[in-house]
């Protein structure tokens, strides 16, 4: 799970199914994780006001809200690109966070070469294997390469690129020959290839065609780790995620289900609130 930390006002626990349960004080029950509700400020502007963000491990969540609500800022807080004036970010221990690089790849590197190079451990081990002379170290290198399934990496990188629209010949062309949109697809392929424990996506379909979008939907549905995604693509949010996190006026509300379910539930909630006034 991931949680924003700032000025604590309440404790919230997650049960094994990812349901939120309030506890004012004390340790969480056995088998539960703890997240906390905090206020978070960035450049003096309140992004979260006594709001909870807790994404259980392995869940796929769409982050929605009006333009300017702070969705992209929230992602940047999680990645560490921004630091809150008041508060901090905590992430599950040893969890790798992945997000698409803002700078599109260029130069002479091919798409498949760029994607493979994203796995710096694999690249480093392969380089060392060419020059290592100590038998023990050579054995360690080959064992580690086996552990990370390094020999299957080229085929996996090629499959991801193919899903995003690159045929076998295009995968070998220099990145400089592609338009900015296609180069952003390479950047997306690289982060998908890495399979981080927390995958952050900000409008990933902006540079995809219909075929690429449909492929991404299927890929995200079977992605083995946590996904937090900002998107205005209603179909994507209906088919690729299992929950919607709504950011409004500094408050975060988690809704189970896709975007249509979120809208229906939110309308009913607003109707009941008006009725009670």
Spans of model-derived segments:
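ABC ATP-binding cassette signature C-motif
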Residues: 45-274
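P-loop NTP-binding core
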Residues: 1-46, 50
């Amino acid at each position: 799970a991931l949680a924003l930390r700032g000025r604590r006002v309440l404790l919230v626990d997650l049960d094994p199914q990812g349901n939120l349960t309030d506890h004012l004080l004390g340790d969480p029950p056995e088998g539960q994780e703890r997240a906390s509700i905090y206020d978070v400020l960035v450049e003096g502007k309140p992004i979260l006001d006594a709001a909870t963000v807790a994404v259980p491990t392995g869940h796929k969540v769409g982050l929605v809200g009006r333009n300017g609500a702070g969705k992209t800022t929230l992602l940047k807080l999680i990645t560490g690109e921004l630091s809150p004036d008041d508060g901090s970010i905590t992430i599950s221990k040893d969890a790798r966070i992945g997000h698409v690089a803002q700078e599109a790849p260029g130069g002479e590197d091919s798409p498949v070469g760029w994607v493979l190079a994203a796995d710096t451990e694999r690249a480093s081990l392969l380089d060392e294997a060419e020059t290592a002379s100590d038998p023990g170290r050579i054995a360690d290198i080959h064992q580690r390469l086996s552990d990370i399934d390094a020999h299957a990496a080229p085929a996996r990188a090629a499959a991801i690129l193919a899903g995003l629209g690159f045929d076998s010949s295009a995968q070998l062309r220099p990145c400089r020959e592609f338009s900015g949109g296609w180069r952003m697809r390479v950047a997306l392929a690289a982060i998908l290839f890495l399979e981080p424990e927390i995958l952050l996506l900000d409008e990933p379909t902006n540079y995809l065609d219909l075929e690429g979008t449909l492929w991404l939907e299927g890929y995200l549905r079977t992605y083995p780790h946590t996904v937090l995604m900002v998107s205005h693509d209603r179909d994507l949010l209906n088919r690729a995620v299992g929950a919607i996190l709504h950011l409004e006026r500094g408050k975060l509300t988690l809704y189970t289900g896709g975007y249509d379910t979120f809208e229906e539930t939110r309308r009913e909630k607003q109707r009941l609130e008006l009725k009670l006034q």
